Amino acid sequence: MALTKAQMKKIVLSFAGANESTSYGYPSFKIEKKFFTRLRAEDNSLVLMVSSIDERDMLLEAEPKLFHITEHYRNYPTVLARLEKLDAKTLRGFLERRWRQIAPKKLQREYLAQDK
């Protein structure tokens, strides 16, 4: 099921430490001061960081209706996800992995302690 911008924003901001910010002059979301994601207004796609260019290429091949890239992102481990094709579970999965990579360890410990 397609996500609205409001639903996407609610999911992104549900991660501990997430806040609205800017990246290179564009509205974005960060965990503390580290880039988390952003919505590209040009094509209504969410910028998602992945572990490698190989992973990105696999995603592009496996789900071309959902994932794409532009020339700007060709040399980066980044994939663009079309918001109208993206579901909440998939988005949470990508964001959780990214959050674990960039959130300070103290924040991660505090967040995980709340789940117990």
Enumerate the language-model features and the residues they cover.
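Charge-dense, helix-prone N-terminal extensions
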Residues: 1-116
